[in-house]
């Protein structure tokens, strides 16, 4: 980046920081992983959270749910030092952080999924995630990638601003206050909860209510008349998908999973776990309060008593709950997401025409209570896949876990088909290290090779004829996880690893080498997640 552009980028980020009310870190800084007592929906419990101040400091006035915002600019080098200060043995005490949506080109060791690219970080230790973001911008997030730890609270938004954003003329305001996070929340800590539990509530920007619970404060998003806001919607869900809308307002969608798209106007968005959208809202309605709605597909649905809701408040409106009603007729369809730049899938425009074609048949084993892909559940290996590769293993046959590793050669077009056969769908599948082109979407029987949606999380659908199909090019060496982003499903096996161009994988820093010996020496008490007998 030339000096003038770097100065502009720095000023841009400073303005975002200045106008955003929320604490933020980045592109360098300490992220403290601590246990904090929280009550985001009126129910008090301990949680695992990410914040900008250590455990020894006073608890922030605002609970650390969601976690601290990380932000920077396109072209930045991110140096995020994760400091583990966890002490509550009822939840996991070790941790590992995934920076969702980043390619990690040349830094697969920093991708974060435990036992795929690293061993977890022990309590009392720290680990520096150091990675470059030369050519990505948009809306991302981060979360624990160790077992189901992020369901206990360790998740937060991550925004990379682009001073040369091609959509810049469409909005006036884009800062920390225009980030909208959606979370499912549980009153029982994950290690003690059911294998696939039902959420107790929905949190919007860390606040919500549960059915039959107290009238807890809801998140308020403030706007001024006639201004245009770029809202960044992030689903940090462990399970449900949400149907999102704002009463009386249309949503001009301009980004999906950090990919700029041809703008499209809708009035509702179905968003699955791990997905992100940016939309522009023009505050052109009467000065009033308007309901923001995020209706989950499971748990307590609807909006009675203010559940699954937040408030859009115009400057000058009374501080009251809205009385507005919902009327939506134009939902966002994935098949209408057209990339703004370089649309089109790689490879010949025929199904099965890629260099490598893989069918992933998902199923549920009622005997073992495991979800499988091609008959095999993903069981985390003792040694991370990356460590195995660096130690000399290079073929699918020699890598563990057996049956869950798929070796991919460099510079090949890969086509993955995922028929919707497994129970518990729709399954939102996320591929690490890449975006992909969705040449066949859920609910569609046609293939689109010319203008397919490009993203990093895709819903596999539930229809008997659904066969979601994606394509990508193997241009990024590393062991890349492909998994269901319903965290409870990942925990019982719904994942595979693509060992891509293994001979070109970059070596990790020396501190990475220390993670496994430290972790392997820990006692069960040090690892946490102890379930009372």
Swiss-Prot record:
- Protein name per UniProt: Laccase-2
- Tell me the compartments it is located in: Secreted
Query: GO: which molecular function terms?
Result: copper ion binding; hydroquinone:oxygen oxidoreductase activity
Cofactor: how bound: Binds 4 Cu cations per monomer.
Q: Other notes on this protein?
A: POX2 isozyme is the most abundant laccase of P.ostreatus under various growth conditions.
Q: Which cofactor does it need?
A: Cu cation
Family recorded in the similarity comment = Belongs to the multicopper oxidase family.
Q: Which GO terms describe its cellular component?
A: extracellular region
Glycosylation: which residues? 467
N-terminal signal peptide = 1-23
Plastocyanin-like domain boundaries: 25-171, 173-336, 382-501
Keywords, A to Z, come to: Copper, Disulfide bond, Glycoprotein, Lignin degradation, Metal-binding, Oxidoreductase, Repeat, Secreted, Signal
Q: Name one GO biological process term.
A: lignin catabolic process
Q: Which residues bind Cu cation 4?
A: 427, 484, 489
Q: Name the cystine pairs.
A: 119-516, 151-238
Highest taxon of source: Eukaryota
Q: What does this protein do?
A: Lignin degradation and detoxification of lignin-derived products.
Which residues does the record give as Cu cation 1 binding sites?
98, 430
Processing after translation: N-glycosylated at Asn-467; contains a high-mannose glycan with a varying number of mannose residues.
**Organism classification:** Eukaryota, Fungi, Dikarya, Basidiomycota, Agaricomycotina
Q: Report whether Lyase shows up as a keyword of the record.
A: no
Residues reported to bind Cu cation 3: 145, 432, 483
Concerning Pfam families, the annotation shows:
Cu-oxidase (PF00394), Cu-oxidase_2 (PF07731), Cu-oxidase_3 (PF07732)
Q: EC annotation?
A: 1.10.3.2
Q: Which InterPro entries match?
A: Cu-oxidase-like_N, Cu-oxidase_2nd, Cu-oxidase_C, Cu-oxidase_fam, Cu_oxidase_CS, Cu_oxidase_Cu_BS, Cupredoxin
Per UniProt, the enzyme's principal EC class comes to oxidoreductase
Record field: catalytic activity: 4 hydroquinone + O2 = 4 benzosemiquinone + 2 H2O
């Amino acid at each position: 980046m030339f000096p003038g552009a770097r100065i502009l980028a720095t000023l841009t980020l400073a303005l975002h920081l200045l106008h955003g009310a929320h604490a933020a870190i980045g592109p360098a800084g300490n992220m403290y992983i601590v246990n904090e007592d929280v009550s985001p929906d009126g129910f008090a419990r301990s949680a695992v959270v990410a914040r900008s101040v250590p455990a020894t400091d006073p608890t922030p006035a605002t609970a650390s749910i969601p976690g601290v915002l990380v932000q920077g600019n396109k072209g930045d080098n991110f140096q995020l030092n994760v400091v583990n200060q966890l002490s509550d043995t009822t939840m996991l005490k070790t941790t590992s952080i995934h920076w969702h949506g980043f390619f990690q080109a040349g830094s697969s060791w920093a991708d974060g999924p435990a036992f795929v690219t690293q061993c977890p970080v022990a309590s009392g230790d720290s680990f520096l995630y150091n990675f470059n973001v030369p050519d990505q911008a948009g809306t991302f997030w981060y979360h624990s990638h160790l077992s189901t730890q992020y369901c206990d609270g360790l998740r937060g938004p991550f925004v990379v601003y682009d001073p040369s954003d091609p959509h810049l003329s469409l909005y006036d305001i884009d800062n920390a206050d225009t980030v909208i996070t959606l979370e499912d929340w549980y009153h029982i800590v994950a290690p003690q909860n059911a294998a696939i539990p039902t959420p107790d509530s929905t949190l919007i920007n860390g606040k919500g209510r549960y059915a039959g619970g107290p009238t807890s404060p809801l998140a308020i998003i403030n706007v001024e008349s006639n201004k245009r806001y770029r809202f960044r919607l992030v689903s940090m869900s462990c399970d449900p998908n949400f149907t999102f809308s704002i009463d009386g307002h249309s949503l001009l969608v301009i980004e999906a999973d950090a990919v700029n798209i041809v703008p499209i106007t809708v009035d509702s968005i179905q968003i699955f776990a791990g997905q992100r959208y940016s939309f522009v809202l023009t505050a052109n309605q009467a000065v009033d309060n308007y309901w923001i709605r995020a209706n989950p597909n499971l748990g307590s649905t609807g909006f009675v008593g203010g559940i699954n809701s937040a408030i859009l408040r115009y400057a000058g409106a009374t501080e009251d709950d809205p009385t507005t009603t919902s009327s939506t007729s134009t939902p966002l369809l994935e098949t209408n997401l057209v990339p703004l730049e370089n649309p089109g899938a790689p490879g010949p425009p025929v199904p099965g025409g890629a260099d490598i074609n893989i069918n992933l048949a998902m199923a549920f084993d009622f005997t073992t209570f495991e979800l499988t892909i091609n008959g095999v559940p993903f069981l985390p290996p003792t040694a991370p896949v990356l460590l195995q590769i660096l130690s000399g293993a290079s073929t699918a046959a020699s890598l563990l876990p057996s049956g869950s590793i798929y070796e991919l050669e460099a510079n090949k077009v890969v086509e993955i088909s995922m028929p919707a056969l497994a129970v518990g769908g729709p399954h939102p599948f996320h591929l690490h290290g890449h975006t992909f082109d969705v040449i066949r979407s859920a609910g569609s029987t046609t293939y689109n090779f010319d203008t397919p949606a490009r993203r990093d999380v895709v819903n596999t659908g539930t229809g008997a004829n659904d066969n979601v199909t994606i394509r990508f090019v193997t241009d990024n060496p590393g062991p890349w996880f492909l998994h269901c982003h319903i965290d409870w499903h990942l925990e019982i096996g719904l994942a595979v690893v693509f060992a891509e161009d293994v001979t070109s994988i970059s070596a990790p820093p020396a501190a990475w080498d220390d993670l496994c010996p430290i972790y392997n020496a820990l006692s069960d008490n040090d690892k946490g997640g102890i379930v009372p007998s």
